[in-house]
Amino acid sequence: MRKELLLAASAFVVSVAGSSVAQAQCVLKGTVIDAATNDPLVGVTVSLQGTPTKVFTDNDGKFVIKSPKTKCNLQFSSVGFESTTLASNHAGEYDFGFIPMASASIALKDAVVTTRAVARKTPVALTTLGAIAIEERVGTADLPKVLETTPGVYIMREGGGYGDTKVNMRGFKSENVAVLVNGVSMNDMEWGGVYWSNWAGLTDVASSIQTQRGLGAAKVSTPSVGGSINIVTKTTDARKGGAFTYGLGNDGYNKLAFSLSTGRTADGWALTVMGGKTWGDGYIQGTDFRAWNYFLSVSKELSKNHLLTFTAFGAPQVHNKRSAYDGLTVQGWQEVGKYMRPGEQYRYNATFGYDRYGQVRHSQQNVYHKPQLQLQHLWQIDRTSSLNTVAYLSLGYGGGESGQGTQEYSSAWYGSNNGILATQFRNADGTFAYGKIQEMNAASESGSKMVMSMSKNLHKWVGLVSTYTKEINDRFNLYGGLDLRYYVGTHTNEITDLYDGAYYIDRYRKNVKPENFAGAGTDAFVNKKLSVGDVVQRDYDGFVAQSGVFGQAEYDFNNLTAFVAGSLNNTAQWRKDRFYYDAAHAESEKVNKIGFTVKGGVNYKFPHIDGWGGQHNVFGNIGYISRAPFFSGGVFLASQVSNQVNPDAVNEKIFSGEVGYSYHTAAFTANVNVYHTEWKDKTMAKMTEIPVDGNVERTWINMQGVNSIHEGLEVDLSYKPAKWFSLRGMLSVGNWRWTNNPVGYFYNSAGQPIDKFGHPLDQSQGPDHARMRFNQKDVKEGGSAQLTAGLGFNVYPMEGLRIGLDWKYFSNYYADYAVTANDISLDGVKTFHTPWKVPAYGLVDLSAGYTFQMGGYKTTLSGNIENLLDQEYISQAYDGAGHDWSTANRVFYGFGRQMSVKLKVNF
């Protein structure tokens, strides 16, 4: 944790420095920073060449060293960074200012280097945030919030629960944005998305976050489409120390955290441990949460050429949600204001309520714990080659609540339907009437009409990434490696509460076919009386096995850098069902898909420095990706209930290219890039609600062969004219649109194919399977702001004090289009038009921090105010029939003003 702990100087260093005071002829000082992130580097060894004198940089990266001679050489060294030497010929006191250290290209360092890129050298569009920037910006929000000022990135909080954030990049949704921790993928192996609630604890252990937009430079075998987010956790500290943090904020937000490090011992051992707890009531009504996080890193320098590191981290959590499908219409939000305090109507939660015993009830609780264990071996084979191997294990436990009901009450758990507040079980005060459900079930002579179940998802995931690096000569480097993954996800749905009924009869049991399950179809099977702990609706395992190789050649000479890279992988996918199939028919066929990537790029740094001390830089990259379809909605169209393989599943094809320019001086940096991405044969799902036998049911439309184009311009800049002031800004202009007219097939909420009346069928894509052609060519893609801008500054008016302000602007957000009940038919056609453009909005965030000494310990008091002006704005919406505000549905408003304060004591 180089950037977090206050490191006390050892007695030896103090005595050496003290003994030299009398004879010192010069005092040299400065601040050592990471060349990639501009963050201070803690624990860097600063030594006088030819003498035993050395000191270490403090928590701010600063050092002071005394030399008996005016002419001397200072050497800077730290694990994972290239050593730097500065010559000095100064009498008296001299300040070197900022001294950048670059990450080592071949050295004992973290596994994350296989996915990190270097600014002004790697030919990709990237943004890197260090630990200090993360701490300054995050406040009480989820970790992705700090990326909001990154070009091309759009953050959504969806229903607004803890960790329910979604990240879109260049218009691509979360399942097409790779999220990595220390170079290891976190994306779900079945559908590609990321549940940030599983990784909320990373806020406290992240040393940097790097976003690579577009193709990126990650050396892995399974690439992303929109870009990648690589979170680098803090390494085992070189010096001992610790920190304690307490934070609090609005709506009962509390946070406790601690960190301890033994420092590196004489025999090469080091241990770092961190932990914390976060809890609160939530900004949205009825979204209270409890979360814990832990982090452990143990390293051992086996020799000067071998480093072994074990890392474990996790973030168990319990949080209540507001369903992502329970957004209302604009008018509907005004109407529910009568249930809330003045000005708080947008916090309303349609499924928050009480039972008949006066106890708080929810139908959207999520409980999960997904720890990850990593064992890394770094081997410096010789001066020009190294082998970096990380093996990892991830185990997931938990799930989310899922209301079940008989056919007539199948949709009664919904808080809203197509943006209209559900009233069947609604109290006069607007709360959901859980007590009425209990009363109905208790009076029923045929068991519970509605019960609560838990959709359990148990994951077991093992993998290995190994990268060999070879420096051929001073111009050529070669990389090559293996990327292996094996995953099994067990998905069940177990009854947790009968809601005062005697038993429950699962309506999905009648869909089990006798030819697949011996004994199915009988009255005893279909009408089996179930109780708490029994399985309903689904019970299956999803298997994904990936094996891949990757390679990259780099050329770096004078001012030219170029690379050519490729990867090849095989993805095997199959499922094993215990609900709709007996043991003899349980396992599906195994589907293998080959994917590959070819990409290359060039970066040229102009050799001459202009009159302002600036350097010009240009880059370009181009690539082609063939990616295997996902398990869910791709290989298996009804992945929750059927072993039937999609006969039309094909690889997605992505072509992408971009060019960029940057200008860099000691105080100013500007980056400009334009990109063009063509995406073909995408599989995509849309949710809608249709009437089925007098009830409203949620259904899914799986579309195949969807094509789109994403292109745009991105600009980011930073300016630091003086030590007391820094300025930053960004602009992103996108043009994201659909380019063809695909066909979609309809499935019910259990994943079963349905006919035009909403009744389940035996076979996907059969003659009676309801389908529809989507005429959407040239229609704007929805779900992300296609124009974003930002401007921010930090002011340092006095020693230890920082005040920061950020303005963010979002425009050209088109509502996601949806399909209504009138659209479903056996072979219909739906023509789409440009969806409603949500009103543009701007937000202002304020942050401040003051560092001082308290009882001899370095202490930082910091605070954040998010949405300082309490701006009212729409952050998410779906298009309606009129393509305007009055017909838009599933609308969510963004959070109002949020405040937090934090005290951190380092020791």
Predicted regions and their residues:
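Conserved C-terminal beta-signal and adjacent last beta-strands/turns
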Residues: 8, 313, 359-360, 603, ...
